[in-house]
Amino acid sequence: MTTQSSAGPQSQPSRDFFASSPSATPGSPSKQASQASKQPDALVTPSSVTANTSVCADNLLDHHQHEPQHDAASVVIGIEGSINDSAAIHRRRQQPRRAAVQNAKPLFLAEDEDDAINWPVADQEEGDDFFSTQLADQKVKRPARATVNSDEKDFQPSTLSSLSSPPSETVYKRSPPSDDVQASNGPAKRPKKSWSTPASVATTKSAPRHCSPTPDPRLRHDAFDRRYIGTFVLSAWSLSKGSSYVKPGDAVRIFRPRKKHATAEPKIASKLTNGGMQKAKQTTLNFRGASAGPTNFFTSKQKSKEKEHFIVRFSNMRGFEVGRLPLEVAIWMSKLIDAGIAEFEGVVVDCPPSLTVGCDIILQVKAYIKFDAFFSTLLGSREFDDQNEALRPETAESDLEKTLRERKISLLRMFRVCDLKPRLSNAILKSHKASDDFSSEAMLDQYGGDIQGAVKHAGSDLAISTENGTQLPHAGEDASSTAIDLDVEGDTDAVAHLEIADQLQSAKRQTDGDADTEENDGTELNLNQLDQVYRKAQANDAHLPEVEPPESFVLTLRPYQKQALGWMKNMEMAPGQSSSSQEQSVTQQGNGDTGERNVSLHPLWEEYEFPLDYDNPQANERLILSATRLFYFNPYTGDLSLDFQRASKGSRGGILADEMGLGKTIMVASLLHANRTSDPGEESEGEINAVDAAEGDVSTKRKGSAKQTSLASAFAASTSSVDQRKALLKASVSKGKASLVVAPMSLIGQWRDELIRASAPGSLTPVLYYADTKGDLLAQLESGKVDVVITSYGTLVTEYRRFLDGGGASNRHLSVSAPLYCIDWLRVILDEAHNIKNRSTMNARACCDLVSRRRWALTGTPIINRLTDLFSLLKFLRVEPWGDFSFFNSFVCKPFQAKSTKALDVVQVILESVLLRREKKMKDKDGKPIVELPPKTIVVKELEFSELERRIYDNVYRRAYLQFASLKANGTVTRNLSVIFSVLMRLRQAVCHPSLVLKAGSKVQSGGIRKDHVDRNGEVGVGEGDHVEVDADAVEFGLDSDHVGGNGTPSTQDLRELVAQFQLDEAGEAGDDSTESYTKATVERLIGEMHGDQATVPPVVSDGENECPICLEESQISPCYLPRCMHSACKACLVDYLGQCKQKGDQGACPTCRKGPVQETDLIEAIRTRPATRAASGGASPTDRPGKACTLTSVPSVIYVRNNLRTSTKLSALISHLNTLRATEAAFKGVIFSQFTSFLDLIEPVLTRYRFHFLRLDGSTPQKVRDKLVLEFQSPSPTNHVVLFLISLKAGGVGLNLTAANKIWLLDFWWNSSIENQAIDRIHRFGQTSPVSVFRYIIKDSIEDRILLIQKRKDMLIKHALNTDNHPHGTKPNSEMLANLDLLFGE
């Protein structure tokens, strides 16, 4: 141990050699060193010698990892001495030993060549540095590592291999990097830089040619291989038996055993076969899906199921394995070794003279942290699988977050056992760690104090005792509700302890080793809880001061909108230093003195000082003379840095969450006029970070005033190089002058029109940046003529992908491919900001990576379902410290899952400072409603399936139920959610229209099923290989066009011919004169009504003519006529009457004159297109045909349609309702919403058949066409006729202004009522002057009934949300999702 500590640290591989090789040579280090002076200088590489030569070289390489060298020549000499002594080593291997020693596994076998191949790239170059004194381009490189273990993939460090420098330059000059730097996002070439260039110049001025705009950030610091962290003592246990292994004072090597790959083993020699070859046992490969049932809906689940072990072993210096470290230590130590973050050396303190298996060995362990660990952060180099991330549940822990969490826990544990305490820490961390309290209650006390009515947290204190006395919580409990007693001195982190303990339990149960395999669900909120969250934020909204807009804003604001303008102007001001509750002063620990920085430490970071290793005076000397003496650690994310982490002044901006329809666009327009430019001295993220880069180590430069910085580098998920981005933004052409508005595609045109309407001519210039309207954005901004750029989320994501695919800021053509990401925006405004609620989506990542000085999120629903919906908004706004998911998850999500009401109180405190929300029902300071809107009426109509529809639906439901039951029986429901949701979608479509469950290749015409869609067996195809068995009556869903004019509406001549063919009886003889006379008179009257020519209409024969002979009701609005006799009756009465006749086996006949036979499809329906009082006005040509652009003059006052269209129950109810309204109201405008565009396809021909004028908007509608459609719908109709707007719920359910309508039809149900409410608020909003009616259709005994039950069930959850979990420990209740599925498929 003394010999190893006599010199400073030397360059070494990024991971301990024994992590990939479980063996070591039994050569003596002292003897190897003694042979150093006997060998000449030579160049030797591990791949150029025999197996034994490689063995010896590798052993000495590993030895030199712990024993630094004085110069490069001694390294070469020592290595060659070891190589030439290979014969002696071989003879020592053959010496007889006792049985225990013979059973011991010598660590160097013939597999060493494979070990060398599997070394990481950084290990290869480190080895070459030891064996060579030549330049880097002359070295012989080993092959790249073939495979990476699953648990190491996310831990691949960005290593910097330090070349061996002359002794005189080691301390005072920075070591240049090797040719290939293994960065976190792949190999990166070393910047070409002169060896004699001073470090300071290289940091601030010199930029490498042909590479990134700025040098490697490692060059800003004095490079070192590793630094001493601390020493701790542990009790290991022996795996060997004998007396010749170790004794007190011996040094030992600590390493990770090589992992076994799941491949068939080769043939091996066996003594049982007398030296022959025995076939190895066959290994069955499990590909995690072929035999384990259906695959998961995102593939990262497979990775988490792979077996993982925490074994850490130690061997003597001769290379023989001695024992293992205890599992409590191995859990966190193995993660650090695998990730190349730390290395460990040990010395035997005490052990028995003769070892036995299982006996205790006391070790003193030294911990070293590697230089590369400070640059291997995953926050700046995230690799995402877009497809899998999109399918990932919103609250599920991603692979990156799991890796960061394990890294964080391991580092915290290492610092704790080494008794390494922070030198500087902010007030939150200091107080919380001192009291061991990282719960929501502590955060509430820190940020907002107590809140009245808070419910006392009820948590379980039961615990499980482990072998070493550690108190472990029961599975599923949170750290905030469990007392943990760990035998570690100093301050502790309860959250980290809990996760360490969970890992320990998992390892002892021999599970897959995941610390947290359960998805992070359980943060769903119901309406009452949402009201509770918003209540505190809305408490003082009525008393906000009103601020008048500038003269350039030409519209008149309402009082509540003036209050919003004043609040937004205040939020864009720089927060005061003393008044900001989120700024924490930096206090200094040690020696009892305190001090303040002009630049405050980031509230999530702590400052540490590298301790001195008193056993290594040379290393201490280098540390004292080095400028890199401090490092920084984030205990919430596990990030390490050598750069000072500065805090910002606070976020500029907030969340404008006014309810839909209150005019958020107009409020933001007034802000754009009020705050046109940035404040003097206001700096952007790029400028702030560039200043930090230029200053280098802030710990040595205390001067300078505090500058604002948002958390782009700490929170934003940027896949580009941070330094490259800083330089790029520093040269931005905008420099905080223009604002960017990001909105759904349907709204960008509306944003432009609203901004122009609200602005005086020439005062504000908005431009669209979308499709062919993009132009040269940078040139427009440079001209100074553009104030606001409006783009869509889709365009932003497209440019973000180019930004990533092009190498980020290093792309020379970034200004052409992705100009939105090379502009320093004054403000970024997200309209409908709930589009980024899922933090894993490209929408969220693209928005968060924009650089801006001010940020705004506009949404009527900042929280839709879960508390985690709020996180993405906080991250986008750079709200410290809540924009970090580890922090948010620890103090909000997990306590809420543990039934702690304090979690909601913390959310209230957060929103109080960044959110403004007003609702339509709220009142102003005088007690008057802030906005007076006309009443809104919601009518729900219950319908029943027809007999045929019921058979089709029951068949689809039966097959769906069987599929769900099969998955549930196999326990694979959660792994096949995509299948379940597909089945549920088919059920919901079957409720709307049976044709929607046809095969994708089938085409539906006129809202029906064609005959060729039914096979010989009468089966109608359904999606995904299912079939619905129906009889040939399914064909009746088609439209029989016989005797029908174009589009199913008979012309005048057609009507005469149609009636004439029914006037002949079965014998071909005409009827009596009275019947014939009545029929002719009725036909002429109907034709006259159709033209609106009342002068030619014969007088009514009798007053009782309009009376239905079945129900005896009068005033038939849309009567049906029997063509044989032209007697009339209500359509519903006739259809029911003819159906009863068919059931009895009788032929249908006229209920008045008994003339027949009559079928249901023979009926002729008379439909009025406008009220009867207006029937005389206007006229039409008999040859007019219907279409999408029908006008009043082209539509007859009465149309006649043959009842030969078999459609769905919902569509029939919709058409009947529309016909009734058209006959009673002069004119109206209505909007029809549906989630399925295929259902809209079926509605279109039916509306055309009944001569309704309609427009349509869905996701396929181009943006320019959308603007024209909305403008046409909002404009007054010159002919004052009925206009309908068909809109898909996703494409037009948000943002649109459709106040011209006053009637709404919602044809299907969504799982979340907030989406439907947003659609309703497109009509019932600011500017609406008429009462609004909402009509909903629900089918009895269908899945829609159960969807409504789920909505009601969510509302009732508040009654049980705060109750403690009564389930026995060790079991889990069904999740909310599974409970809902059980409800949907229940009996």
Swiss-Prot record:
A motif (DEAH box) lies at residues 831-834. The keyword Metal-binding applies. InterPro entries: Helicase_ATP-bd (IPR014001), Helicase_C-like (IPR001650), HIRAN (IPR014905), P-loop_NTPase (IPR027417), SNF2-like_sf (IPR038718), SNF2/RAD54-like_C (IPR049730), SNF2_N (IPR000330), SNF2_RAD54_helicase_TF (IPR050628). Residues 1-49, 132-219, 503-528, 573-598, 676-704 are annotated as: Disordered. One of its GO terms (cellular component) is nucleus. ATP binds at D658, E659, M660, G661, L662, G663, K664, T665. Residues 1-14, 194-206 have a biased composition (Polar residues). It is found in: Cytoplasm; Nucleus. Probable helicase, member of the UBC2/RAD6 epistasis group. Functions with DNA repair protein RAD18 in error-free postreplication DNA repair. Involved in the maintenance of wild-type rates of instability of simple repetitive sequences such as poly(GT) repeats. Seems to be involved in maintaining a balance which acts in favor of error-prone non-homologous joining during DNA double-strand breaks repairs. PANTHER family: DNA REPAIR PROTEIN RAD5, TRANSCRIPTION TERMINATION FACTOR 2-RELATED. This is DNA repair protein RAD5. The gene is RAD5.
